[in-house]
Amino acid sequence: GDTSKVNPLSPVDLVIDHSVTVDHFGDDDAFEENVRLEMERNHERYMFLKWGKQAFSRFSVVPPGTGICHQVNLEYLGKAVWSELQDGEWIAYPDSLVGTDSHTTMINGLGVLGWGVGGIEAEAAMLGQPVSMLIPDVVGFKLTGKLREGITATDLVLTVTQMLRKHGVVGKFVEFYGDGLDSLPLADRATIANMSPEYGATCGFFPIDAITLEYMRLSGRSDDLVELVETYAKAQGMWRNPGDEPVFTSTLELDMGDVEASLAGPKRPQDRVALGDVPKAFAASAELELNTAQRDRQPVDYTMNGQPYQLPDGAVVIAAITSCTNTSNPSVLMAAGLLAKKAVTLGLKRQPWVKASLAPGSKVVSDYLAQAKLTPYLDELGFNLVGYGCTTCIGNSGPLPEPIETAIKKGDLTVGAVLSGNRNFEGRIHPLVKTNWLASPPLVVAYALAGNMNINLATDPLGYDRKGDPVYLKDIWPSAQEIARAVELVSSDMFRKEYAEVFEGTEEWKSIQVESSDTYGWQSDSTYIRLSPFFDEMQAQPAPVKDIHGARILAMLGDSVTTDHISPAGSIKPDSPAGRYLQNHGVERKDFNSYGSRRGNHEVMMRGTFANIRIRNEMLPGVEGGMTRHLPGTEAMSIYDAAMLYQQEKTPLAVIAGKEYGSGSSRDWAAKGPRLLGIRVVIAESFERIHRSNLIGMGILPLEFPQGVTRKTLGLTGEEVIDIADLQNLRPGATIPVTLTRSDGSKETVPCRCRIDTATELTYYQNDGILHYVIRNMLN
């Protein structure tokens, strides 16, 4: 065949940011050591990506150790308006974007319409397929007033997230307007736009205005581009004028003067908690964990570096300044540095059990912290640079020191992580950390000093100065004037310097040699990259869709099941199906790497499907982790093992779930994995947008229970057998009768709604998935 047909039709930038792990921390060598380990562990994957760079046109690679894709996009790649020569004339048109990470929405802060899609949908878009969707409602969010002294952009975004989740914006666009935008810096806008997936919207859009242009100049964009953006936006009616009141489907309003210092946790980004209420929220979550308020967890003795310590219940064991959400924002980074400076000056120290780290989304952050002379103070408190990448925010927090891990297990302690990230789902940050809290960078530093979630930072001392006097948060919190003076040190020269060689990479990256070829040379013994089975039995023409007969329920799940629950990205347990597979193929435990790094190997990923250590399958009450029953038997076994038994029996499978199924990351393996396990249908109360699309893209049918009907109202046990007929005549949005046969032989038919929303999606489903459809189109 003609391999040149398989080439992107639109410009594609691949930014490598998800692989660096915080193995080393707390010293000046941490960055170099983590980069060395990243290159060592991921050498084969990086060879594959480098091969792709030379094999495809319109395809650029930003090497590892450079930054986080959304921050690199905001600071450098995004244009706001594109221009190109067509038929001898220059044409200008709005920038737009889809990305394979849900936080792609960050670019909406720059006035660029963009959102996350699954990898399979992105691959199809690269090859010329349209991104189809129902015309969305547009919710207007009016911002008025200004943030008060001491309140950060992080506090604002956590408040916005809570409000919009409550309002209900899944599948909708959100546009921000109001006089509050007149003084809202672009970095704050980007923080709010970044967390669109957390509030459930397809995007959170900020229109182009003078503040947009100011940021483009600061970040080193050319004068010609800035002039084009202004001229084009004004000519096309895309320019925001003060006082504009667009027409929206619905609206809500926030006076930014009402925003208070906040965290979100312990396991959902929308669960905002006022700073003074954190100890109470932590205690409630710890009691829930115990199922009793009676048990008193005592501190556990441990020794580290020859010193005896006690690890208390509620200890903050991870404090991470991480994630593009906040490290793209100079005001909160400078605030963290200034707070660190005041703390060090007074003699405060990080608690010895806290693993602290600083992982910015771009090298510019290091430049301006150094320019402000704040780096030494962050280093003194253990917030040394550990990498330029996602790290803790995506679960690459690395191991805790061995004495800490042992103490947590010994005392069955409920401990916490505080991070400046965007997600805090169960089991995501670290397997032993049961509560995870989102906070601004200065609060991350403050919690590293306090070291305990039970300490009320609004009223209790963080520690004691050299004289023994108590030091409170208010004593070291920087003023708005101090922060503003520090932010003035950020210059366009910093951006130009760091992005001048953004595609070059380190010497280690440059030294990777690849074969010049249009086709990849698969290695049969590779445990990282294997030829996937998704095209194994594909025919030139799609077969008619088969009805679902005699399907068994593989898992019955509750509300807010995330793609992290379905396909975790973090560490691989040695005694899990994926861990056993790797060991059987000669991989030592120290070389397991993460599920995220093994995504090129379907054997690992299908074994990791539903393998999150915190997932709860209601078919096995009281059991945590990826376990189920192989029906009609009663024995508990891993979901993977049960699925393989069902495949031997040729039994199709179903998943039953509650509200917001598939929220979180745009992780396509959360659809690919279930497909390989034999799942044909997912029936839920509601779906998150990207995951619903991914399921269809892999030929899995998403169905919604009718309003008011749930697995609980139906009294489902998971032992039911499911039949769904007449799938050849499926229509978008149609009502589909689902027949449930209970273990006593009684039957009930439930009219479910087909969540294939568009004719294009139906075509993908009828082709057994989007990739089959694209390949068939190419063959024709």
Locate predicted features:
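Fe-S-dependent hydro-lyases/dehydratases of central metabolism
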Residues: 1-780
